C-alpha cells in the first residue's frame, strides 16, 4: 500500500525543498505563535509559492478564529486545514463549510477513553490525525516527540482516512505503520536536531524508511 507522508512544521526553503524533492505527499506549516515552528504570513506565502503543486500544503492551526483562518488561507492557499486544538465536531463541520476546504482533525490519544469522540469527529472531518496527548503543563498540543500506545489503534476501522503522529522517527516509522495500519504518517520533531530546526538528511531518511516499509504492508 502507498502511505501518505506528511512533513510538518517546515519553515525554511532548504528543508522544504528537501521534503518535496524526497517525495513528501504533504508539507505542513504551523500558524501558532507558541510553537517554535510558527511561520508568519509573509514567510508562509513564500514557502507556499515554492511548493506550487508538487505537494499538498497543510495549514496547522490551534483553536483559530474564522478571522485568523481567513488570513491563513489567504497567505498559504492550503489544500488542507489541520485543526490541532480542542475544536468540537460542530466547529470542525462549520470550518469545513465556511472555507470550502477539506479538514483534518487531530485527536489526542493517551488511553482508549480518548477515542470515545472519534465517531463524531470522523463524521465531521475529511481525515483524522492521531497524536499523543500532551502533558497537562505543555504549552502546545503537538510536536513534542512523545509517542502514544499505537496498539490502541489496532483493528481500527473509520469511514475516513487517518494518519498517525507523535514521537515517530526514521527508526520507528515502520513499526508505527505495522501496528496501526495507518494510511498516512506525520512527522515533525522526529526530523529535527532541535525544536523547530528541521534537518534535510533526517527528512530524506524518514521518507526512505517509510517507503521501504510499504513493501511489507498489504
From Swiss-Prot:
Biological-process GO terms, alphabetical: L-tryptophan biosynthetic process
Keywords: Amino-acid biosynthesis, Aromatic amino acid biosynthesis, Isomerase, Tryptophan biosynthesis
Keyword Ribosomal protein annotated: no
Pathway: Amino-acid biosynthesis; L-tryptophan biosynthesis; L-tryptophan from chorismate: step 3/5
Top EC class, one word: isomerase
Known EC number: 5.3.1.24
InterPro entries: Aldolase_TIM, PRAI_dom, RibuloseP-bd_barrel, TrpF_fam
Short name of one Pfam family: PRAI
Entry keyword Transcription regulation: no
TM helices/strands, residue ranges: none
Family, similarity comment: Belongs to the TrpF family.
Protein name in UniProt: N-(5'-phosphoribosyl)anthranilate isomerase
Amino acid at each position: 500500500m502507498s502511505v501518505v507522508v506528511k512533513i510538518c512544521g517546515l519553515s525554511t526553503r532548504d528543508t522544504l525543498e528537501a521534503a518535496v524533492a524526497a517525495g513528501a505527499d504533504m508539507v505542513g506549516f504551523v500558524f501558532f505563535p507558541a510553537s517554535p515552528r510558527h511561520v508568519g504570513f509573509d514567510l508562509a506565502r513564500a514557502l507556499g509559492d515554492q511548493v506550487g503543486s508538487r505537494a499538498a500544503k497543510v495549514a496547522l492551526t490551534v483553536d483559530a478564529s474564522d478571522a485568523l483562518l481567513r488570513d491563513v488561507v489567504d497567505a498559504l492557499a492550503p489544500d488542507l486545514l489541520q485543526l490541532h486544538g480542542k475544536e468540537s465536531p460542530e466547529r470542525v463541520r462549520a470550518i469545513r463549510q465556511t472555507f470550502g476546504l477539506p479538514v483534518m482533525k487531530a485527536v489526542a490519544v493517551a488511553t482508549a477513553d480518548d477515542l470515545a469522540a472519534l465517531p463524531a469527529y470522523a463524521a465531521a472531518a475529511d481525515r483524522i490525525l492521531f497524536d499523543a496527548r500532551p502533558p497537562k503543563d505543555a504549552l502546545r498540543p503537538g510536536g513534542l516527540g512523545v509517542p502514544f500506545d499505537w496498539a490502541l489503534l489496532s483493528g481500527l476501522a473509520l469511514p475516513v482516512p487517518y494518519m498517525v503522529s507523535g514521537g515517530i522517527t526514521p527508526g520507528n516509522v515502520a513499526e508505527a505503520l505495522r501496528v496501526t495500519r495507518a494510511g498516512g504518517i506525520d512527522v515533525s520533531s522526529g526530523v529535527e536536531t532541535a525544536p523547530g530546526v528541521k534537518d534535510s538528511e533526517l527528512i530524506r531518511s524518514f521518507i526512505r524508511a517509510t517507503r521501504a516499509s510499504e513493501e511489507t504492508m498489504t
